[in-house]
Amino acid sequence: MIIDVNIPIPFRLDKYLKRLYPLLTQGVIEKALRQKQITVNFQKAEANLRVKVGDTIFINDYFNLPVTQHETLVFADAEIKLAKKILTDYLIYEDDHLIAINKPASLATQGGSKINLSIDSALKYLNYQGADFKLVHRLDKETSGLLLIAKNYLSSVKLHNAFKEKLVIKKYFAITYGRPVKNVGTVKSNIGKSKRRLSKIANIDSDDGKLAITYYKLLKSLNNNLFLIEFMPVTGRMHQLRLHAQLLGCPILGDDKYGNKEIMPYSKYMFLHANNIYLSETIVGKEIKLEAKLPFYFTRRII
């Protein structure tokens, strides 16, 4: 049997075979490799060899493969195109532990009842092809900027715990309508689900909400009562920065959910961008500093 490898990223040979044949055990794979019943490009291969597009796996006809293969899944063309963009156009960093992408606004991180295309659905396609990507945090659909994606289970656990323990430093740029009273400060509030509108999050200083903390700094005064502000969330509550901007009296431009449509200028985009992420050496074994380029519409506003 001949298997042409078509995964878009290098992937361990043993894991790739297990995805094709879930009933194959590690011991059986390693024995078959030692006996050259399974080879790669006509060469003897180790289980940890990373195969990639263009490689060919040869399986001896006398080798008894398990009958059951993985379920055949069908992916939309849009998901396949997005998957390729994640690994090319959007990609700004990659190592053995993670990739970082610059997510555009209007693209959801995860799917939902009214969302057909998302980063998560594209990752499922890549994983079906042999990768092992896992989301470790999320950005609102309307928010652009840095999104980290783990490349394996162990890295996902490390990164998830780092976010949970507030070890990841994140900085966002926002253009707001109006300015805070103080140029530098801290916002603290409880954030929980609105009891009147389940689709909306509200500030509620009660036992129902969870504590949310955000540092902010006014960076620049722009035209038409618009201001550039840097936000640094300590916690990661849903819609936290959007709510805290509203609480400061300066909602984010383009925020239809928490802004005042009657007085704010119309904007096609929401001006909130995840600009910087810092990971200390203790998280994945090395210090990582990342920056995501501002989208064109954001840059035009602050020049």
From Swiss-Prot:
Signal peptide: none annotated. It catalyses: uridine(955/2504/2580) in 23S rRNA = pseudouridine(955/2504/2580) in 23S rRNA. It comes from the Bacteria. One of its GO terms (molecular function) is 23S rRNA pseudouridine(955/2504/2580) synthase activity. Its EC number is 5.4.99.24. The keyword Isomerase applies. It is an enzyme of class 5 (isomerase). Keywords: Isomerase, RNA-binding, rRNA processing. Belongs to the pseudouridine synthase RluA family. Responsible for synthesis of pseudouridine from uracil at positions 955, 2504 and 2580 in 23S ribosomal RNA. This is Ribosomal large subunit pseudouridine synthase C.
